[in-house]
């Protein structure tokens, strides 16, 4: 399992186009970010407009390096797009609200802060914990751990001893996640 970072409408569109495209989808395994950003092409010595997905993987990796997958890969602490020179549009608060209400994660520019991911919604339409990227990534991490660490128990008898072996494997991991603010 993974979170797919989908590219929005082509470069040069507006907020309404970005929200309309996102509203046609419904998945807590995908996220959309908007608008496009300008980055340096170091090989050719020019600047290029690129879709957000070019940078978002780096944001997720940075988030995991300085925090954990269950922290929001967004905001001024973990969402700065260091390679971005500028966002295609300077979004107003109203633009950011419209995008976020439609499950499109705004890429905003703040004075003195640079270009920043300022949202962490999945494309899930129903309001729940799973409409957040960090919650989906937490569940992916937990599922992956449980699947890999308990696969040797799959064909064992369903006994109290087998269940206890499973708990002895999983509970320390969940305790660690909880101690790192992943679960409450």
Regions found by a protein language model. Give the residues of each.
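Structured, hydrophobic secondary-structure cores that serve as assembly/anchoring elements
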Residues: 1-184
């Amino acid at each position: 399992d993974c979170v797919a970072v989908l590219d929005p409408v082509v470069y040069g569109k507006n907020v309404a186009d970005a929200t309309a495209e996102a509203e046609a989808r419904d998945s807590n395994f995908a996220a959309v970010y908007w608008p496009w950003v300008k980055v340096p092409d170091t090989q050719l010595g020019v600047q290029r407009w690129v879709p957000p997905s070019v940078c978002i993987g780096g944001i997720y990796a940075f988030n995991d390096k300085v925090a954990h997958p269950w922290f929001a890969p967004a905001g001024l602490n973990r969402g700065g797009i260091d390679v971005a020179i500028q966002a295609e549009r300077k979004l107003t608060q109203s633009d950011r609200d419209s995008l976020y209400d439609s499950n499109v994660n705004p890429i905003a520019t703040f004075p003195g802060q640079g270009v920043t991911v300022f949202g962490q919604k999945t494309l899930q339409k129903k309001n729940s914990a799973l409409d957040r990227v960090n919650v989906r990534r937490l569940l992916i991490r937990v599922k992956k751990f449980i699947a890999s660490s308990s696969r040797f128990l799959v064909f064992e008898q369903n006994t109290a001893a087998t269940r206890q072996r499973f708990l002895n494997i999983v509970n320390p991991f969940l305790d660690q996640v909880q101690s790192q603010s992943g679960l409450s």
